[in-house]
């Protein structure tokens, strides 16, 4: 087999081995993608966003239940916001 053909064969097989070793990519979840995008736009960046999901740097009444960080109560397992006026 000529060198060029051998090289092309190796280049074709190498990516298949890499994909097989890593495994298939995880399935795409649109809901997680939307939540992540919304958090990037509106919610306070902190290492663990789970309890702070409702807290925003600005008051956003009616926007996914988000409220300002100053009035957001995250003392329990979930954050609570006072009712919007």
UniProtKB/Swiss-Prot annotation:
Expressed by the venom duct. Keywords: Disulfide bond, Neurotoxin, Secreted, Signal, Toxin. Contains 5 disulfide bonds. The keyword Metal-binding does not apply. The keyword Signal applies. One of its GO terms (molecular function) is toxin activity. Residues 22-40 form a propeptide. One of its GO terms (cellular component) is extracellular region. It is found in: Secreted. Residues 1-21 form the signal peptide. Its main location: secreted. The cysteine framework is XXVIII (C-C-C-CC-C-C-C-C-C). Belongs to the conotoxin D superfamily. Probable neurotoxin. This is Conotoxin Lt28.7. The lineage of its organism: Eukaryota, Metazoa, Spiralia, Lophotrochozoa, Mollusca.
């Amino acid at each position: 087999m000529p060198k060029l053909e051998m090289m092309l064969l190796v280049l074709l097989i190498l990516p298949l081995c890499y994909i097989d070793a890593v495994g298939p990519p995880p399935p795409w979840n649109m809901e997680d993608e939307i939540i992540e995008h919304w958090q990037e736009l509106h919610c306070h960046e902190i290492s663990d966003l789970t309890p702070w999901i409702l807290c925003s740097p600005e008051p956003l009444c009616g926007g996914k239940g988000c409220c300002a960080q100053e009035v957001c109560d995250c003392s329990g397992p979930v954050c609570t916001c006072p009712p919007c006026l």
